[in-house]
């Protein structure tokens, strides 16, 4: 079984997570979703089996939804996080505008 480095490593701990620990764990979960997307898409792009490709792509898309859910939760728990992501989006929007 893979070790994902979660706060509890698959077992309930004898204490609850602090809010800071929860926020860090959710960031990790976002990263894990992106890693899963990458693995599923690499596998889908590496086969000519249409069924496997379709199923893997569908699963990858579900992981994108999960990432969005975790991000929304993260924004609620750590409002500064959303502000920083928004700042990054605006910086790239400026670059895109400069290309036009």
Where do the language-model regions lie?
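Iron-associated oxidoreductase/ferritin-like identity signal
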Residues: 1-100
